[in-house]
């Protein structure tokens, strides 16, 4: 293989992936390795940073096998916004009551700190405006407070380094303790213009983090894509099979890498409403285990229940608002795999050689007369999808799932309908988030989807039909990996900025447009959707009186 390349590494919830990417954005090779998720009790999710780094090394070696290491110009890392804890000697510290040191990562979806998050919200600090007014248990301050209160001796007093997972990867690669502006601004309450706020950390009981200029959580900050340290250390280069000094870009949260991987695509001639419009008309929707809804603006926009605005957290000079759903792919798996007919579905999928969701989509086609009729099969079946709480736009971690319209049926038809209703509920949740952002001043006209669920044709079409917006799918479906490679390209100085690299490396694959015949159906479905939450809160209130 000739020419030169960049490597993108993406650490997701359940796997590590790497890609070898050409300067024009083509993914020449990809590799994937699973990583374990430990669930010692309800709402606790833990991982091992040692295993994660090992899988990073394995995947990078696989995609660069046979490639002259001198041809790899830069590498970029992204990861989930999980919390990594190390001691003074950079050894893993247990984040669990069992004292298992190898499990030193509190995952992003861990909700153990729900009570701490509620107490932080009750402080009413002005800084909470940056997180939609409500502190989420999915970002770092509540998790840190939980560790201090529940593991004071075994973890808190021994911990010297708290990293967001993307920053841990940068440190392993370069030895630099600098943090990415992306992670600190979005998950740690850092301000791009004002830095850390001492009054916030003191108010929530974490004043000890202020010591030594916040050395335990980050005293040096660099912009996404900036070259970190002196590139790969000798040890990291040996681990990864690359050359010492290879440029390493300041890391990104995985959703932000997805946004960078899709938003810059040229839409000329596609007759989309965002054509000839700035990037502020586009929303990136990164759909995997969870979903993130990323929109940028030229001026800061405060959206109740939506994280941000964050200056330059994803794109330089633009303010980012980040909505999201805590469980999307995970919810679909929960609904489908827990059904009595799942084994029958699994057997059919194995026999046909199809993925289970492709098989379900086909089954729904067989149950309907046409595409319009298919989505109306759930006229009397409705779901509120917040089985793991509502991240946006309600910011209600106490919200739970609701299903209206169940029967005694345990057939494959029943499973298919529940699956369809779940897809629609997730899409209606996206509509809810977009509505909140629009009310606050965003003007979103086109969706750009990526992530694992973007490969599900019915998920994509349902989003177009529910929101009434066209959906753009990237030519390279692994857009998160592409986004990671973009920051590697920026670090190498082959591209002078992230926007330049986005234009060079992102391309449109396919456009999915809404079906106007379903507009009335989804208007009514959305009205029911909103009432499900209202009724849930009424029921809770009645029982608590």
Curated annotation (Swiss-Prot):
Gene: fggy
CDD domains: ASKHA_NBD_FGGY_D-RBK
Family: Belongs to the FGGY kinase family.
Keywords, ordered alphabetically: Kinase, Transferase
Record-linked Gene3D superfamilies: 1.20.58.2240, 3.30.420.40
One cellular component term from this protein's GO annotations in UniProt: cytoplasm
Enzyme Commission number(s): 2.7.1.-
Lineage top rank: taxon: Eukaryota
InterPro entries (alphabetical): ATPase_NBD, Carb_kinase_FGGY, FGGY_C, FGGY_N, FGGY_RbtK-like
One GO BP annotation of this record: pentose metabolic process
Keyword Kinase appears in the UniProt entry: yes
Protein name per UniProt: FGGY carbohydrate kinase domain-containing protein
Any single Pfam family the record assigns to this protein: FGGY_C
One GO MF term attached to the UniProt entry: D-ribulokinase activity
Lineage, top ranks: Eukaryota, Metazoa, Chordata, Craniata, Vertebrata
């Amino acid at each position: 293989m000739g020419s030169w390349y960049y490597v993108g590494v993406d650490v997701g919830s359940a796997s590590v992936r790497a890609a070898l990417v050409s300067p024009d954005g083509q993914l020449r090779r990809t590799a994937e390795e699973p990583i374990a998720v430990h669930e010692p009790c309800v709402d606790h999710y833990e991982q091992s940073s040692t295993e994660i780094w090992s899988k990073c090394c394995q995947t990078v070696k696989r995609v660069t096998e046979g490639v002259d290491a001198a041809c790899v110009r830069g590498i970029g890392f992204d990861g989930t916004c999980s919390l990594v804890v190390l001691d003074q000697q950079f050894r893993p510290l247990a984040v669990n009551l069992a004292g298992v040191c190898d499990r030193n990562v509190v995952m992003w979806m861990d909700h153990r700190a729900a009570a701490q998050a509620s107490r932080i919200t009750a402080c009413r600090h002005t800084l909470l405006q940056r997180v939609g007014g409500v502190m989420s248990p999915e970002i770092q301050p509540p998790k840190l407070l939980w560790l201090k209160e529940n593991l004071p001796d075994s973890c808190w007093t021994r911990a010297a380094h708290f990293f967001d997972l993307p920053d841990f990867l940068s440190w392993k690669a370069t030895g630099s303790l600098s943090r990415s502006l992306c992670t600190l601004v979005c998950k740690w309450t850092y301000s791009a213009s004002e830095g850390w706020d001492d009054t916030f950390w003191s108010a929530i009981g974490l004043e000890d983090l202020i010591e030594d200029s916040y050395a335990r959580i980050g005293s040096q900050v660099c912009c996404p894509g900036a070259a970190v340290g002196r590139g790969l250390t000798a040890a990291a280069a040996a681990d990864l099979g690359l050359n010492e000094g290879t440029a390493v870009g300041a890391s990104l949260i995985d959703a932000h890498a997805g946004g960078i991987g899709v938003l810059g695509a040229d839409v000329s001639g596609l007759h989309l409403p965002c054509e000839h419009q700035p990037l502020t008309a586009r929303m990136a929707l990164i759909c995997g285990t969870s979903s993130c809804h990323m929109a940028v603006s030229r001026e800061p926009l405060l959206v109740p229940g939506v994280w941000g605005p964050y200056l330059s957290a994803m794109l330089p000079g633009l303010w980012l608002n980040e909505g999201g759903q805590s469980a999307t792919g995970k919810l679909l798996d929960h609904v489908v795999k827990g059904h009595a007919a799942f084994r029958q579905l699994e057997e059919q999928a194995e026999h046909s050689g199809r993925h289970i969701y492709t098989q379900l989509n086909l089954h729904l086609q067989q149950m309907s007369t046409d595409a319009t009729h298919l989505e109306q099969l759930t006229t009397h079946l409705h779901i509120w999808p917040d089985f793991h709480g509502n991240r946006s736009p309600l910011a209600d971690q106490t919200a739970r799932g609701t299903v209206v319209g169940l029967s005694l049926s345990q057939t494959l038809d029943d499973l298919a309908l529940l699956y369809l209703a779940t897809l629609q509920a997730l899409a209606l949740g996206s509509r809810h988030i977009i509505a909140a952002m629009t009310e606050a001043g965003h003007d979103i006209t086109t969706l750009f989807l990526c992530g694992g669920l973007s490969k599900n044709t019915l998920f994509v079409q349902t989003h177009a039909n529910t929101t009434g917006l066209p959906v753009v799918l990237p030519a390279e479906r692994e857009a998160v990996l592409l986004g990671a490679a973009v920051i590697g390209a920026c670090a190498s100085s082959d591209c002078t900025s992230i926007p330049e690299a986005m234009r060079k490396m992102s391309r449109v694959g396919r456009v999915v447009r809404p079906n106007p015949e379903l507009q009335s159906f989804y208007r009514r479905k959305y009205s029911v959707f909103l009432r499900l939450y209202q009724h849930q809160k009424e029921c809770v209130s009645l029982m608590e009186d």
